């Protein structure tokens, strides 16, 4: 009787219980948890290895119904595709309750997200293949000493590559390298024109912009001077129309301009009207840099002046730029001495007008106190280029040369959009992903050859290691470093298993760092002259990211995931 009552009570409690969300917690002592975490990266490895080295990837974008083709040379778009894949996995998990209880899928997404965060922009076949191979070896021997051996092997490779990186300096060598890196003579000629415009000083990826053009041929536009990190004030449509920005898309003034720096928010028209009158009579334009905002009556006066001068064929215009402290290394206008010197402000930081502290309002009467000058400006709402030539006699405090650079815009031409997109992606990758990093910090042989060159040193490191399990970790690195070359030779040349092994053995035995065989029946070639190079900094960052991810995954003992709430539908 009592047993039956308890059974009924238990059934009643079960029916009336409230279901609550739980937080899945996984212990990494269970190796299956780590294997599930690696599953997402294995999927990524299949995608990357099958679309690298002259291969292409077909995918359907998020907001397009037709499939798109991504070349292996277009690293930026390939990285965006992987980000879209990660986002789609996360959205599917949030909207599908069944997937929330699917442990392998959940852990695979977590592992993939951590890997992408660690590897950052160095998403290559090398990073994915090394990570998967090294962790598979660790799963066989999950010991801390094995992890130490893996880290020691990766650090040895990084040191080895740093000591042997190849510096390419002469213009002839750079031109020869460009010839090998490009797919057509038109691409190489355009890249050489860009390099010549900047005197072959391509040491940053923000010097050259590659965009789609609207003609059948390529155009090179050079913007000299200070690359200002903010564009024209875009908070007022009437002001933008007064500069004809909606139609011309660009404000370009190639004559001497007055410069006025204003510390604070400019609202009162009386603070700017004397300057407007002075500039209109001189028929000169004004560059107004505001540390704050320009609004109210002041902006209205500026707009009216621009429209009036346009009707009267007066060249005077007022271009308003906002000063961004964050974009100027957290320097206030008064602290940014290099910028003040560049603008040729007559009294240094004392020429910055402050309505609270300055005794005089800028005008013709005190022009020698407030107004600087620049020789030309090119500006949009996104950025601006200010130019002043450096003259040691005219400017006692000479501006450092590093603050004056040529910024080149290369507009890619073609007969159709597909051709333009393909050429833009290839040229952009060559300039801003390969050449800029390689010319700045050095090159190493590509196709995984540089990793093969480190194998003799890894063997010595392994032989001198007294701890057996640490040797196992170094041996895992020895097994993993040949994988990038296997993928490269298979995808790029279509070699079979025996030919690939022969080429790998030849590269290991060749003592000269830049020399390697790329055909089973040929002699070793110089990778510098042959153009088979990649930036050292990219490989170094890749190895550092792999090491960080492995250390992160093997050092934690708990993985805590979350259950996503289904998005709520808001009633209209």
Curated annotation (Swiss-Prot):
Q: Which residues lie on this side of the membrane: Mitochondrial intermembrane?
A: 489-572
Parts of the chain on the Mitochondrial matrix side: 17-471
Cellular compartment(s) = Mitochondrion inner membrane
Give the bilayer topology.
Answer: Single-pass membrane protein
What domain of life is recorded for the organism? Eukaryota
Q: Where are the transmembrane segments?
A: 472-488
Instruction: Give any single GO term for biological process.
Output: protein refolding
Name the Gene Ontology molecular function terms of this record: ATP binding; ATP-dependent protein folding chaperone
Which keywords does this chain's UniProt record carry? ATP-binding, Chaperone, Membrane, Mitochondrion, Mitochondrion inner membrane, Nucleotide-binding, Stress response, Transit peptide, Transmembrane, Transmembrane helix
Instruction: Tell me yes or no: is Mitochondrion among this UniProt entry's keywords.
Output: yes
Q: Which family does it belong to?
A: Belongs to the chaperonin (HSP60) family.
**Subunit structure, briefly?**
Forms a high molecular mass protein complex of approximately 850 kDa.
State the protein's name: Mitochondrial chaperone TCM62
Its gene name is TCM62
